[in-house]
């Protein structure tokens, strides 16, 4: 058994309840009485998901945000969270808790409980959070398995900022200070918007969050849905900060499309819902961009300016 995919495949023999969705989605979906509960869990590990010298408050914010992103992808309203904390330096822990409180307030997801553990000295610290949400009434909870041929492919926000933000945080990137700060903020404090997920849920056929990279997550959606997805690389939305620092070349776009930590929404919807999707984004003042189409077939295809573009060897982050 090697890698995350093989391990998850082995877990499927245990997670046979329909609520687990075959361990092929961003969250579990559990019917309880007249309510639909959405449950998700993520872990952040020092040296993997955050830098050892990242501010503790930013680490806490990211822990909450990545879970809220999963709830958003299911169109769920945040209900509460539980988390486990690896105890360490008292001052660091106090700053972490301040960031946790700030994030829980920002995303309206109250802390309900959790666990603590004392780590051996010099061990990388890790933190896990389980988020609970409620699905929209009279609306199926979106999955990544229901994209249909003829759908348009959409993404929210802008793509690739966090990767450059990580480089900026490491001092590896040159450019205008204001733009570097903007990019670093996207890495340190992603800001998923559950209200957009809620608004989109009745309109989409498939939806997931972009966490490991736009291309690899689109490929996963295509595989899960048994369809092909064609994306126009030239239509992928980039921020002004990214363009100012990295340019708007095919290479820069490919780098952005294979980066992770975006925590935007990737979704497919019938063409007749285009106006309502744009309206949902407009009401919330959030960018939504059509970047491709769902096709009969399988796999992922890329183009730019109407010409085919070869897929890169690495589509995104692999665990």
Annotated model-derived regions:
Residues 17-19, 27-28, 100-101, 115-120, ...:
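A generic local secondary-structure boundary/capping motif
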Residues 1-58, 74, 83, 103-104, ...:
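Extreme N-terminal cap/leader segments of soluble proteins
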């Amino acid at each position: 058994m090697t890698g995350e995919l093989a391990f998850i495949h082995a877990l499927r023999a245990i997670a046979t309840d329909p609520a687990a969705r075959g361990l092929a989605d961003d969250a579990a979906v559990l019917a309880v009485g007249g309510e639909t509960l959405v449950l998700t869990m993520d872990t952040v590990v020092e040296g993997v998901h955050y830098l050892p010298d990242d501010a503790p408050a930013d680490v806490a914010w990211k822990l909450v945000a990545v879970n809220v992103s999963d709830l958003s992808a299911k169109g769920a309203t945040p209900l509460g969270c539980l988390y486990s904390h690896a105890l360490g330096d008292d001052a660091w822990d106090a700053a972490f808790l301040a960031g946790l409180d700030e994030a829980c307030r920002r995303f309206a997801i109250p802390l309900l409980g959790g666990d603590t553990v004392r780590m051996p000295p010099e061990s990388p610290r890790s933190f896990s959070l389980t988020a609970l949400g409620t699905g929209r009434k009279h609306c199926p909870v979106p999955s990544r398995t229901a994209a249909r041929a003829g759908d348009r492919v959409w993404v929210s926000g802008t793509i690739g900022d966090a990767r450059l933000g990580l480089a900026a945080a490491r001092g590896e990137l040159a450019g205008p200070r204001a733009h570097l700060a903007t990019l670093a903020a996207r890495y340190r404090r992603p800001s998923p918007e559950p209200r957009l997920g809620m608004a989109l849920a009745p309109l989409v056929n498939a939806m997931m969050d972009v966490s490991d990279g736009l291309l690899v997550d689109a490929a996963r959606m295509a595989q899960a849905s048994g369809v092909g997805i064609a994306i126009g690389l030239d239509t992928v939305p980039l921020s002004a900060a990214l363009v100012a620092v990295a340019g708007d070349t095919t290479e820069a776009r490919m780098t952005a499309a294979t980066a992770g930590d975006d925590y935007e929404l990737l979704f497919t919807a019938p063409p007749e819902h285009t106006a309502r999707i744009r309206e949902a984004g407009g009401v919330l003042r959030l960018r939504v961009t059509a970047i491709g189409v769902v096709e009969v077939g399988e796999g992922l295809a890329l183009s730019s300016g109407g010409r085919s573009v070869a897929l890169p060897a690495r589509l995104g982050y692999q665990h």
